[in-house]
């Protein structure tokens, strides 16, 4: 499946970002394009994005400050 021409292949679909929440807190996520992560401030976790796919598993998340 190819990404639309108006966004890079490794980016996440904006519509998907609107509906995703942190699996731990059910709170909002912030997209960090530079690090390719979804940030949950309330859980203090950063979920990785691999090949444009968010990995929403707490055991795969990186702890943040």
From Swiss-Prot:
Pfam families found in the cross-reference section: Trm112p (PF03966)
Name of the featured protein: UPF0434 protein BBta_0300
Superkingdom of the organism of origin: Bacteria
GO terms for cellular component: cytosol
Protein family: Belongs to the UPF0434 family.
SS bond partners: none
InterPro entries: Trm112-like (IPR005651)
